[in-house]
Amino acid sequence: MKKKIGFIDLFIDEWHANNYPKWFREAPLKNEFELGYAWEEKTNEGGKPLAQWCEGLGMTPASSMKEVVEKSDCICVLAPANPEVHERLADLALRSGKPVYVDKPFAPSGKAAERMFALAEQYKTPLMSSSALRYGDELLDGKVKALEPSIFCTTGGGRSFDEYGIHQLEMIVSMMGTDVKDMTLKGDEKKLTLTLEYADGRLAQASYSLYLPFTVSAAGEKGALVLPAMNNTFQNLIAHMMTFFATGVSPIPKEETIAIASLLERSTALLHGKK
């Protein structure tokens, strides 16, 4: 019997929920899973209501969050533009013991991230969260890590750094680790550079502006690489997510996810002039 994937969302008619079903149906483990129940807390202004959305995407509208959790084998908590609601929307799922994927950004603060993992561990619930940019072909092939880079630079765009900065921080932490001792930010909401200094002296830098593509440059004593694009990010993310759903083992250490949430919290505080 195929495992059922359930969706929980703030409002269901959004880009991730609209595209994940197609990628689930094309993924390497597609024959082991099927899309099941979906629920939204509210309908987005101008968006499709749940029943209409489900009809178009081949899912079943649920009457409550509880119904999704009870009738699913694995659960996606979406709301990719609203990390402030993730802890609330994921609460029942994190008590279920079933694999739960929480969309990016995982949490609005490091403390919230810690609480979510603590709740998941209390109920023995496997938990995973990631930006798709961790899973670009160019980062998965191992060449960047093989350089043992002393400096790692990313660029990226999107509507705002608050929402899209997660992508660059995910790439940085996945390649460079979590031991960041200092952080500086220059710029404003339209353009900025964020510099991370690691405890061992390594450096990482993220540059943001609306139209910048997602790129990576890395260098160390073994050489240098310039990667002008990140390819197949979402397809690779979905493949890893489905393996997680099948095994109950997250491919990402929780320490990285918590660190990324903390770094995003700190960097946006610097951006907006908060201490």
Describe each PLM feature range:
Residues 1-54:
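N-terminal Rossmann-like dinucleotide-binding module
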Residues 36, 72-73, 150:
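Conserved acidic residues
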Residues 151-213, 255-262:
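Rossmann-like dinucleotide-binding domain that binds NAD(P)(H)
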Residues 7, 210-275:
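C-terminal active-site/capping subdomain that shapes the small-molecule cofactor and substrate pocket
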Residues 17, 113, 139, 168-169, ...:
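A general structural signal for well-ordered alpha-helical segments in protein cores
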Residues 101, 106-163:
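A contiguous active-site-proximal alpha/beta segment in oxidoreductase catalytic domains
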Residues 2, 52, 56, 60, ...:
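C-terminal helix-rich "cap/oligomerization" subdomain common to oxidoreductases
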Residues 31, 53-117:
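Beta-loop-alpha module in the N-terminal Rossmann-like domain of NAD(P)-dependent dehydrogenases
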